[in-house]
From Swiss-Prot:
The modification Phosphoserine is found at residues 3, 17, 19, 232, 312. The modification N6-acetyllysine is found at residue 21. It comes from Homo sapiens (Human). The gene is CKAP4. A lipid is attached at residue 100 (S-palmitoyl cysteine). Mediates the anchoring of the endoplasmic reticulum to microtubules. High-affinity epithelial cell surface receptor for the FZD8-related low molecular weight sialoglycopeptide APF/antiproliferative factor. Mediates the APF antiproliferative signaling within cells. This is Cytoskeleton-associated protein 4. It is a single-pass type II membrane protein.
Length: 602
């Protein structure tokens, strides 16, 4: 505020100086014209600048005073100019004071708004800080509630364990009560046995006394009888002796029976006493059990960890077993596909054998046709040696017949060539299929070896093992059947060389006939015979190719036989793996039983 007052005073003196120096009054009007219009919404200036107007009035008064002096000195003409200058100076002073007040109001408004913004920012920061603290309190409260829930769950588990321990102690107390009751019963039985033993001893004592009395009475009677009659004495002595012996025997029998009964009761008592000793041992066992329960409570946590580890291992073992079962199923499917491929190959071999039989039949018919050709050639020779008159006509007829026969032979040879070509194609297909079968068999061997290595440590279900064994056996049976078919094919191939030899003989005969009948062959078109010879050569080459293909088939069959032997070894390995799986299953059952016992103890 003092600075504002100083600024106002400086502005007042500055505005009054032109009037004192005699400045032109138009300067104030120009300044007033150059000033911008006031803002429409400018707030009213604060009342603080009002004291600044008092120092501004002094220059005006001074100006008026000076003007008065000047006017008084200069005359009436100068008084009007001085009044206008004073009015201009007053307007300039008023405009400068208004601009200063406006600037000061703007600065104060800016400071006020800046303070409001700072207060709002500070309040927002405080609210944000308070919200973060509230969130932290909520989080801590949630953590505390979670800890309370966990503690509640732990307390519930402890309560359950305490209840189970109470139940076990209740059972132990019931067992103790039953053992005490049995002990009371045994004590009562011991007392009863002692009373019976005392009663038996009393009875025996009475019997002894009675016997002694009888003996003493008998002795007295004998003494009296001696005096009376010796004969009657003997009779009475004998009677009394017999009676005494009977009574003694009866008493001895009774005594033995009583002794046996007493011995049985004593044995029963001994057994009961032993059971009582066992009950005392049970007390000691109960104490040991209490200590063991405490130890179990202390080691329960470690056992829980062990149980979790066992569960995890069992789950991993189950997952591995499931994967192995899936692999076994896939292997079973592949073996079924292999079986189907073997069946198809068997059918192809059967078709090939049928084609071979047909070719053999056609080849077996060739010698007859060649014989017919020889006969026709002989007839042609005989016709050629006949009279020359009918030679042209007969020659033409023979030539036509020979052409017809050659055409028939060509058709038959073409049929044979077609059969041989089909046999070649079938043999090529057979070799390709056998190669594919060999590759598949090698893959199966590798997979079986890998599966056997895995099955040494893991187990699978008996149904899958039985199914795998059955599939392997069926595959072995199909391979045996295929082996039989291939053996038949070998036999048929073994018969092929004889047919080739017969074809060679026929070819030689044809060559000889052609050499003998060169003149007749010169008349006939030789190109047909050359074609026939070339067809026979082609037939021979095709037959040799068939022999080579059949040799390849033999090697493939031998490899299949070796593969069947490998399959038998794989079956044996699978049986051994099955035994290992049974052992593993038994070990797993024992492990489960141990785990259940641990659960029961816990």
């Amino acid at each position: 505020m003092p600075s504002a007052k100083q600024r106002g005073s400086k502005g007042g003196h500055g505005a009054a100086s032109p009037s004192e120096k005699g400045a032109h009054p138009s300067g104030g009007a120009d300044d007033v014209a150059k000033k911008p219009p006031p803002a429409p919404q400018q707030p009213p200036p604060p009342p603080a600048p009002h004291p600044q107007q008092h120092p501004q009035q002094h220059p005006q008064n001074q100006a008026h005073g000076k003007g008065g002096h000047r006017g008084g000195g200069g005359g009436g003409g100068k008084s009007s100019s001085s009044s206008s200058a004073s009015a201009a100076a007053a307007a300039a002073a008023a405009s400068s004071s208004a601009s200063c007040s406006r600037r000061l109001g703007r600065a104060l408004n800016f400071l006020f708004y800046l303070a409001l913004v700072a207060a709002a920012a500070f309040s927002g920061w405080c609210v944000h800080h308070v919200l973060e603290e509230v969130q932290q309190v909520r989080r801590s409260h949630q953590d505390f509630s979670r800890q309370r829930e966990e503690l509640g769950q732990g307390l519930q588990g402890v309560e359950q364990k305490v209840q189970s321990l109470q139940a076990t102690f209740g059972t132990f107390e019931s067992i103790l009560r039953s053992s005490q009751h049995k002990q009371d019963l045994t004590e009562k039985a011991v007392k009863q046995g002692e009373s019976e033993v005392s009663r038996i001893s009393e009875v025996l004592q009475k019997l002894q006394n009675e016997i002694l009395k009888d003996l003493s009475d008998g002795i007295h009677v004998v003494k009296d009888a001696r005096e009376r009659d010796f004969t009657s004495l003997e009779n009475t002595v004998e009677e009394r002796l017999t009676e005494l012996t009977k009574s003694i025997n009866d008493n001895i029998a009774i005594f033995t029976e009583v002794q046996k009964r007493s011995q049985k009761e004593i044995n029963d008592m001994k057994a009961k006493v032993a059971s009582l000793e066992e009950s005392e041992g049970n007390k000691q066992d109960l104490k040991a059990l209490k200590e063991a329960v405490k130890e179990i409570q202390t080691s329960a946590k470690s056992r829980e960890w062990d149980m979790e580890a066992l569960r995890s291992t069992l789950q991993t073992m189950e997952s591995d077993i499931y994967t192995e079962v899936r692999e076994l199923v896939s292997l079973k499917q592949e073996q079924q596909a292999f079986k189907e491929a073997a069946d198809t190959e068997r059918l192809a071999l059967q078709a090939l054998t049928e084609k071979l039989l047909r070719s053999e039949e056609s080849v077996s018919r060739l010698p007859e046709e060649i014989r017919r050709l020889e006969e026709e050639l002989r007839q042609l020779k005989s016709d050629s040696h006949g009279p020359k008159e009918d030679g042209g006509f007969r020659h033409s007829e023979a030539f036509e017949a020979l052409q017809q026969k050659s055409q028939g032979l060509d058709s038959r040879l073409q049929h044979v060539e077609d059969g041989v070509l089909s046999m070649q194609v079938a043999s090529a297909r057979q070799t390709e299929s056998l190669e594919s079968l060999l590759s598949k068999s090698q893959e199966h061997e590798q997979r079986l070896a890998a599966l056997q290595g895995r099955l040494e440590g893991l187990g699978s279900s008996e149904a899958d093992q039985d199914g795998l064994a059955s599939t392997v056996r069926s595959l072995g049976e199909t391979q045996l059947v295929l082996y039989g078919d291939v053996e038949e094919l070998k036999r048929s191939v073994g018969e092929l060389p004889s047919t080739v030899e017969s074809l060679q003989k026929v070819q030689e005969q044809v060559h000889t006939l052609l050499s003998q009948d060169q003149a007749q062959a010169a008349r006939l078109p030789p190109q047909d015979f050359l074609d026939r010879l070339s067809s026979l050569d082609n037939l021979k080459a095709s037959v040799s190719q068939v022999e080579a293909d059949l040799k390849m088939l033999r090697t493939a069959v031998d490899s299949l036989v070796a593969y069947s032997v490998k399959i038998e070894t794989n079956e044996n390995n699978l049986e051994s793996a099955k035994g290992l799986l049974d052992d593993l299953r038994n070990d797993l059952d024992r492990l489960f039983v141990k785990v259940e016992k641990i659960h029961e103890k816990v």
